[in-house]
């Protein structure tokens, strides 16, 4: 791992521990999917930054593209994945390459996939055959943005990077790739991961607002497949072997310690070069899948995993599961970290999110942010409920629910989130 990456990671930990306030999760329409609740040995794999039309590095696959190598391996083990693709990075210039082994290896101001000055070999725009193969073999395609521009500043590792100006730019970029897949392949994407997990935008919005507009869910991951980090070995072959082992060993060790460790988890992988321009994933993926298979795991796409349960803390064994699944399709009932927290007392703000129409809740909040640069998570929904006489004008979002409007609920004295959802007249 390069010095800049080490310093960046250390700096991020310091900021998170001493400067950044504890993240407060709120109920919304978009939630960050890292894992789901299940006791079954089923997990998902995602592959970022492809498709890649260039060979693996080192090339020991007769010139096959890296994406083809990954697809061959997945097919061999009967696995399916979510390919988190980009559109095209050809417009990301002027730029120059950074130091090999650093986070800027492929570009100082922009990302370039699969490499700087090789943009015409990467992305959905230039790899029709690979996109069609991904779909024909029943994998999922998700939206990693068209140009792979970060949504806002990331000062430590990517301080020199150009970024989008705000919500409208982010939605336009996401929609460009969305329409490419829809128009050319009749495929509708439903999940997205922001470039480098940068969420905050300069205009007060976040990736969650962009995904609200796109009707997406936020695809994250709970386990790092590790193929993106370079080894410090100076010998190329030793470095490759070290990188391959760094991908295999953590999975094996986790399962030896707890055979159910990966139940419901999402494993992050890379469909491209690591920071040393090698592709250890081409050599390690088969071994990873072999180990998972030995422990009885089925590897699927994130979309399939969410069919098992769309929630992080509630599974099919919960008596309210089916109702919650149906409610979540049209109502905001889940926190941004994909937890339901059914035993917590419900607040007025959370109740407003259940009752207000999605369009009203989102549009009112967006309008307030555009005007004032900030808004509470529940401001749009609460204002609609108050204007329509459903909730009292004196009600505050943070207050706990003590009564429920009879038009929407069966009678109950249980004002936990479980009790309120159970009483809702769906």
Protein language model regions, located:
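Catalytic-site microenvironment of enzymes
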Residues: 3-4, 282
């Amino acid at each position: 791992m390069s010095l800049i990456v080490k310093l960046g990671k250390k700096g991020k930990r310091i900021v998170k521990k001493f400067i950044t306030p504890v993240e407060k999760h709120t109920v919304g329409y978009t939630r960050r999917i890292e894992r789901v609740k299940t006791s079954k040995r089923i997990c998902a794999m995602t592959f970022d930054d492809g498709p890649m039309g260039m060979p693996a590095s080192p090339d020991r696959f007769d010139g096959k593209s890296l994406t083809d190598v990954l697809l061959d391996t997945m097919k061999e083990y009967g696995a399916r994945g979510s390919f988190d693709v980009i559109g095209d990075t050809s417009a990301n210039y002027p730029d120059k390459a950074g130091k090999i082994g650093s986070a800027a290896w492929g570009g100082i101001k922009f990302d370039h996939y699969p490499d700087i000055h090789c943009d015409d070999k990467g992305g959905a725009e230039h790899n029709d055959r690979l996109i069609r193969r991904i779909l024909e073999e029943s994998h999922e395609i998700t939206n990693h943005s068209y140009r792979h521009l970060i949504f806002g500043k990331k000062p430590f590792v990517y301080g020199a990077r150009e970024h989008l100006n705000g919500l409208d730019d982010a939605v336009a970029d996401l929609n460009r790739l969305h329409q490419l897949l829809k128009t050319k392949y009749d495929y509708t994407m439903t999940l997205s991961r922001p470039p480098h997990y940068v969420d905050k935008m300069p205009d007060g919005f976040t990736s969650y607002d962009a995904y609200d507009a796109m009707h997406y869910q936020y695809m994250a991951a709970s386990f790092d497949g590790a193929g993106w980090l370079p080894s410090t070995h100076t010998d190329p072959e030793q470095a490759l072997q070290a990188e391959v082992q760094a991908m295999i060993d953590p999975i094996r060790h986790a399962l030896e310690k707890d055979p159910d460790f990966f139940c419901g988890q999402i494993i992050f992988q890379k469909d491209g070069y690591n920071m040393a321009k090698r592709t250890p994933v081409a050599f390690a993926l088969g071994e990873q899948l072999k180990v998972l298979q030995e422990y009885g795991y089925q590897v699927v796409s994130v979309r399939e995993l969410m069919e098992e349960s769309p929630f992080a803390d509630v599974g099919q064994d919960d008596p309210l599961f089916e109702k919650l699944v149906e409610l979540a399709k049209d109502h905001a009932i889940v926190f941004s970290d994909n937890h339901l927290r059914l035993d917590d007392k419900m607040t007025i703000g959370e109740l407003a999110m259940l009752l207000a129409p999605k369009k009203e809740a989102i549009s009112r909040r967006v309008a307030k942010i555009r005007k004032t640069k900030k808004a509470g998570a529940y401001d749009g929904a609460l204002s609609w409920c108050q204007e329509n006489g459903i909730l009292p004008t004196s009600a505050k979002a943070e207050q706990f629910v003590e009564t429920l409007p009879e038009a929407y609920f069966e009678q109950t004295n249980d004002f936990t989130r479980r009790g309120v959802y159970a009483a809702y007249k769906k």
